[in-house]
Amino acid sequence: EHLMFGGSVNIPDYDAPLQLAGGENNAWTNNDITNYYLTVPRQNVETGFWLESDRMLSLDFSERSLEVQRGVVMEEFKQRCLNQPYGDVGHLLRPLAYRVHPYQWPTIGKELSHIANATLEEVKDFFFRFYAPNNAVLAVTGNISFEEALHLTEKWFGPIPRREVPLRQLPPEPVQTEERRLVVERNVP
């Protein structure tokens, strides 16, 4: 998710043209989806389509961008999961609730080393496996007609090649038949 803001081959600084157009953006990820969103004034809606399609088509993968974003995500992990009381409760509860299903693993990683050891090749593999127009949902709201939104979608996303996206086959979680408990004791100041 974070690398999507590192720029593309054509647009090295994703935020600069968006901010010049009066827009803002953000994103979030959970186990099922990554949601990127942006808001632009009506007169600059095509800028939003251009920016989103460009990074889907030609994201710039570089070690520098990976290192910058790795640092950001590691700090996010520390802030949310390590540096506040009960910050790791999700990390502790997930494996209790799920034994087989991938929901047992936190999206951000189970530990800092998962972030620290991610390679550029792994990131590229994930991107080229899942990031394609035929594996995306585009929602457009505001003062824009359906016809214009469809036209801009076809104009900006139509030329991007489809990819063979693997079918998501998640293992079913077995029915829980027993109580699961975890007692955590810590020295809290």
Residue map of PLM features:
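Divalent metal-coordination and catalytic microenvironments
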Residues: Y36, E52, V73, V123, ...
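M16/insulysin-pitrilysin zinc metalloprotease superfamily fold
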Residues: G6-S8, T39-R70
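Short amphipathic alpha-helices in soluble, non-transmembrane regions
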Residues: W50-D54, L150-F157
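Non-catalytic beta-strand/loop surface segments
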Residues: V9-N44, R80-N135, P159-P189
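Short beta-strand-to-loop capping motifs
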Residues: L38-V40, V140-I144
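Non-catalytic accessory/assembly modules
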Residues: R64-G71, Q84-L92, I144, H151
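Bacterial peptidoglycan biogenesis and beta-lactam-recognition machinery
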Residues: F5-V9, L57-S62, F146-E147, W156-V165
